């Protein structure tokens, strides 16, 4: 790479202040470029340019977001002369008659993130130390991370430092590790740009720089792709099959403080669909953590190879050669299925720890941190209770918005209820299929009465007794337990 970011703290602070004054935010980008504008590619730049107004904010987006050269006087008018000088001092731009950004400065919420060029623009030319910005996996990692005041946080494979900065808002101290020196340079610059002084960057592979240390929050969006290559620091882990992800999970367990949480984006392999989650369940077993396995994409050999080499789709011959190399690699390993997803960990004392698996849609996941905390807290309480019927004496309330749906079948003439769904409308947006008759019990969970009393009242209202009342109680307990384990309900 022909340029290198420079963590000049004074210059970065000056630039950050100027960007805040002009209100360069994610919302502003969407307002000016449209809903799809935030994910713009290099090919879309000509259209984006023509959408921008002739204003100070428009000039800033043209230079920093679209990465187009602008007259130095125009950018000085928009941001101030000191900000233009800061762009040069931090290595972010070449300044002459025009200001030309070497990379991009992208607003992520109210943060500013510097990184390399447009992602995937010409991946074949990307150097091994290429540093990406706020990718879809970065967004997912953020959405799945429990937040709150903590002493220490750790971000593994920090890249441009997005997760480290998000943790730095509430952690007294954040350690960011990466094997790529250039990534740490970006992280240091981004920390300065956003005014963070509590992020420490350490060079090294994964957990090696923090040997013997523990943390309250651990995040990892390190290169988890199952790949026969070792080309890019941001994609290829360099170990066989899913060993890179296995190492991350097992080391995270060792480095979590008591009551700490880890959010790890990983991938795992399987020989067939019937055994698709065996690997992550094995990784998480035996440690002092409860785990939540969240598969997102489960792909066969060919689809996996295509997904991670889509940058070659305009070059049929090399594209085919790469696909053959990837599928042959997986075939030699006996791998039929590659799954990408997340593993969430919560460390707690006790002799019994549990895992569960739920498939999620990453397009629907949004700020699930509170849901995740409630879920792990509820699971710990359920372990303490012991017998399933002990839950009857507990008071439980819904923890957020849920939608109760009934399924009707009208094909036989008169509509007949055939199913029901409790849809969680926040966080991971998971749903629980159930029986129509249990929806009224869900609606009555306000924490004022015990679960046993709520179920007994429902049985009386329906005139149920004996085996029918026992069946209602059993089914209701199963449903309430499921809602607790998903973080859709809480103990009152």
Locate predicted features.
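Long, charge-rich, low-complexity alpha-helical segments
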Residues: 56-103, 142-146, 154, 159, ...
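SAM-dependent Rossmann-like transferase core, predominantly class I methyltransferases
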Residues: 94-153, 158-166
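Conserved SAM/SAH cofactor-binding pocket of Class I
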Residues: 135-220, 226
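Conserved Class I SAM-dependent methyltransferase catalytic core
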Residues: 180, 241-295
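Mobile active-site "lid"/loop adjacent to the S-adenosyl-L-methionine
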Residues: 181, 222-247
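Flexible, glycine-/basic-rich loop-and-beta segments that form/coincide
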Residues: 301-379
């Amino acid at each position: 790479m022909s340029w290198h970011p420079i963590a000049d703290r004074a210059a970065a602070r000056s630039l950050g202040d100027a960007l805040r004054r002009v209100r360069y935010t994610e919302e502003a980008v969407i307002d000016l470029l449209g809903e799809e504008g935030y994910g713009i590619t290099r090919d879309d730049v000509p259209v984006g340019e023509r959408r921008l107004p002739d204003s100070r904010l428009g000039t800033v987006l043209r230079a920093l977001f679209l990465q187009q050269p602008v007259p130095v006087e125009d950018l000085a008018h928009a941001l101030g002369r000191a900000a233009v000088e800061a762009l040069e001092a931090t290595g972010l731009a070449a300044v002459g008659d025009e200001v030309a950004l070497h990379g991009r400065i992208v607003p992520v919420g109210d943060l500013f993130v510097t990184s390399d060029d447009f992602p995937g623009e010409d991946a074949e030319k990307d150097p091994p130390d290429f540093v990406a910005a706020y990718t879809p996996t970065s967004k997912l990692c953020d959405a799945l991370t429990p937040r709150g005041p903590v002493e220490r946080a750790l971000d593994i494979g920090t890249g441009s430092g997005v997760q480290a900065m998000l943790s730095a808002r509430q952690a007294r101290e954040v350690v960011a590790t990466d094997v790529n020196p250039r990534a740490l340079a970006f992280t240091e610059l981004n920390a300065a740009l956003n005014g963070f002084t509590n992020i420490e960057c350490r060079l090294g592979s994964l957990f090696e720089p923090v040997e013997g240390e523990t943390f309250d929050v651990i995040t990892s969006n390190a290169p988890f792709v199952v790949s026969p290559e070792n080309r890019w620091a941001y994609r290829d882990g360099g170990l066989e099959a899913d060993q890179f992800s296995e190492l991350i999970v097992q080391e995270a367990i060792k480095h979590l403080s008591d009551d700490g949480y880890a959010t790890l984006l990983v991938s795992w392999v399987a020989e067939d669909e019937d055994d698709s989650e065996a690997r992550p369940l094995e990784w998480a077993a035996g440690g002092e953590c409860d785990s939540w396995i969240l598969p997102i994409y489960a792909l066969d050999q060919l689809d996996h190879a295509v997904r991670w080499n889509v940058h070659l789709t305009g070059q049929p011959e090399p594209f085919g050669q790469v696909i053959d190399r990837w599928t042959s690699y997986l075939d030699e390993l006996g791998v039929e299925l590659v799954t990408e997803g997340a593993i969430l960990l919560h460390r707690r004392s006790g002799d019994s720890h549990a895992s569960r698996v739920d498939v999620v849609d990453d397009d629907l996941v949004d700020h699930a941190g509170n849901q995740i905390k409630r879920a792990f807290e509820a699971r710990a309480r359920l372990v303490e209770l012991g017998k399933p019927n002990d839950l009857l004496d507990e008071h439980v309330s819904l923890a957020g918005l849920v939608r109760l749906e009934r399924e009707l079948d009208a094909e036989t003439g008169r509509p007949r209820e055939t199913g029901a769904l409790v849809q969680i409308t926040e966080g991971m947006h998971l749903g629980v299929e159930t029986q129509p008759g249990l929806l009224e019990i869900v609606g009555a969970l306000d924490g004022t009465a015990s679960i046993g009393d709520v179920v007994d009242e429902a049985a009386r209202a329906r005139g149920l007794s004996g085996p029918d009342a026992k069946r209602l109680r059993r089914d209701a307990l199963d449903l309430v337990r499921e809602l607790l384990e998903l973080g859709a309900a809480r103990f009152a």
